[in-house]
Regions:
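Nucleotide-sugar donor-binding/catalytic module of glycosyltransferases
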Residues: 1-109
Length: 109
């Protein structure tokens, strides 16, 4: 079980997705699971997610059959989450490489 489950709802963000996922897999705190919920993207987002999942076993991909919006996608991801803590990152954003280390240390102190 991961300490932190990071949920990323994805819809047509292929332009930004590499930077987002790179920022997550390169965290200084690596006891995370990265749950990416593809919300029926019509671009190459799903292919990008699958590539990252093959490279890093912390990356999990969930496919929504229909575009349902970020709230439903996040709720679907929550059902798969095993972490003690939950974090949300937008798929067109990225985080600093020590973000989750700082967050975790703050929570446990």
């Amino acid at each position: 079980m991961a300490k932190i489950s990071v949920l990323v709802a994805v819809y047509n963000t292929e332009k930004y997705l590499h930077q987002c996922l790179d920022s997550l897999i390169n965290q200084t705190f690596d006891d995370i699971e990265i749950i990416c919920i593809n919300d029926a993207s019509t671009d190459c987002s799903l292919k990008i997610l699958q590539t990252y999942a093959k490279k890093d076993n912390r990356v999990k991909v969930l496919e929504m059959p229909l575009n349902s919006g970020s709230a439903k996608a996040r709720n679907a991801g929550l059902r798969l989450a095993t972490g003690d803590f939950i974090a949300f990152v937008d798929s067109d954003d990225w985080v600093s490489n020590n973000a989750f280390e700082q967050i975790y240390n703050t929570f446990i102190s």
